[in-house]
Amino acid sequence: MDIRIIYSIQDAVGKTIKELGYKFEEINEDIIDFRYEKGDVIVVFSRHESSSKIPSLTVHYPGNPIDKTMGGEPKKLGIAFPSLLTSIYREIRKINIDIEKAIEATHHGPTYQHIPIIFVEIGSSKEYWENKELVKTLIEATLRGIDKYKDIECENKIVGFGGTHYTPYFSLLAEKSCVGHIISKYYLAELSNEVILQTVNNTIEKIDTVMFDNVNSKIREKIVNLLATYKLNFKFR
């Protein structure tokens, strides 16, 4: 598997990576709207921004679940790679630093590529984006996750609906299951049939379980009925 690791020189974390001397591939494009597509998989290091400014280390897939976009195309999800994302996340969880660690729900672009993209991010302010020791620690954990992904335990390969953006429930499930796309509660009311199908189709590993985190019965029924022919397990919380 040809896994390409990239950063953008337009991105604050990318600039720190360059200063550290890592020989990853450098792009000069918007980190949420790039067109780069080489290898079999792309792992992207970038900054994470949030209004709360809470320090964090996060992983997620790109995708715009509804018409509103942040780079990429509307109603388009990227390609998921559950065992690789989960392997990276499990190594990040081992970092002995008091900082939030989470799998984020699917959001922002790019969505143009036909291969999996996984974002590995540092949040949520300049203080952390430019912290060379923290950036180095995150890179080393990510590289360990890449090395181990073929051997990790995956009781199930799941997609998730509901919960908040930082997905505490699905992040917890990643201790034993491998995680594909997660659609947070904020998008569910506007979610099209097409995007629901993409959650299980846009992946290079077969999904076997759909998890719901406090989703109302009407939306839950819509999703279950639409995915009924896929022979999936449905679990509710």
UniProtKB/Swiss-Prot annotation:
Keywords: Hydrolase, Metal-binding, Zinc. Gene3D superfamilies: AF0625-like. Its EC number is 3.1.1.96. GO terms for molecular function: D-aminoacyl-tRNA deacylase activity; zinc ion binding. The keyword Hydrolase applies. The keyword Transcription does not apply. Binds 2 Zn(2+) ions per subunit. One of its GO terms (biological process) is D-amino acid catabolic process. It holds the Pfam family tRNA_deacylase. Its cofactor is Zn(2+). It catalyses: a D-aminoacyl-tRNA + H2O = a tRNA + a D-alpha-amino acid + H(+); glycyl-tRNA(Ala) + H2O = tRNA(Ala) + glycine + H(+). It comes from the Archaea. Monomer. Belongs to the DtdA deacylase family. This is D-aminoacyl-tRNA deacylase. It comes from Sulfurisphaera tokodaii (strain DSM 16993 / JCM 10545 / NBRC 100140 / 7) (Sulfolobus tokodaii). The lineage of its organism: Archaea, Thermoproteota, Thermoprotei, Sulfolobales, Sulfolobaceae.
